[in-house]
């Protein structure tokens, strides 16, 4: 049962009996007031409690069951014998019908001991000086029997059932919120792979937020709900693998760029494509006007300042790193070879290459 339906039933069960009680009080006050006003008519018995002046503008008279009522015909008649009364069933009312229940006196219709069946429309007809009619509606409040008690019992039963349902719903909601809060606290204390599983379990337990939630509960759970949503968002972002794979790929590319691992086949092709340098292209001329250094050795030779500059031919060759390593290996191998003593004098005038002396000048 929805909350607004329960509240509507509760309000109806309280307001309707109160309305009937207030209506009964107002009716009793009206009866006592109109009984005093009707004392001027001496022809009416003292048992009449209502007069014709009690009808309202819409010509409706309300009477309790078991009381007496008097209805006045507001039409002008030359003789009172010309006034005739009829009920809603079309029966003409006079003193002889029903053992004197309806009494017609002048232009008044007196009904004694009103019953619930007497309700309806009462019409008076006037034949002189002109033909006219006037109607009054009589409403009777049913008081005999156990209807009021039955109605009160039904209202109390409905109110009790509604109250029990509301209390049960509030208790279930409170228990559910306590369990959810406990699960959220356990989620914050959980680390590792179990955190995602806890998140899914808590997401299943969170109820749909409706207007039935009170403001106090919303304030209490607002902070933890926001924190939980933030953790869920972080977990959702960490689940997809493509960003992680892209980061690993970028890391591997950076590592290869730092190491510079070259393919040997590509290295040989680049060596073949490199143009050879000739002797003339590898000679660089030092500017004769270049000044001497400021070293102490240079300053000590004062006579060399007046000497003219000389041209020095220098041949430069560019070698790759692999070629340099091979040259270093060959130089280390040649250092282990010791030349014979008999040609020690010629060592200064010979070029040693590949284990033999070339261009020796003796």
UniProtKB/Swiss-Prot annotation:
Stretches assigned to the Extracellular side: 19-147
Biased composition (Polar residues): 323-337
Disulphide bridges, residue numbers: 73-124
Parts of the chain that traverse the membrane: 148-170
Matching InterPro entries: Ig-like_dom, Ig-like_dom_sf, Ig-like_fold, Ig_sub, Ig_sub2, Immunoglobulin_dom
Phylogenetic placement of the source organism: Eukaryota, Metazoa, Chordata, Craniata, Vertebrata
GO cellular component: extracellular region; plasma membrane
Main location: membrane
Residue ranges annotated as Cytoplasmic topological domain: 171-362
Full protein name: Microfibril-associated glycoprotein 3
Presence of the UniProt keyword Signal in the record: yes
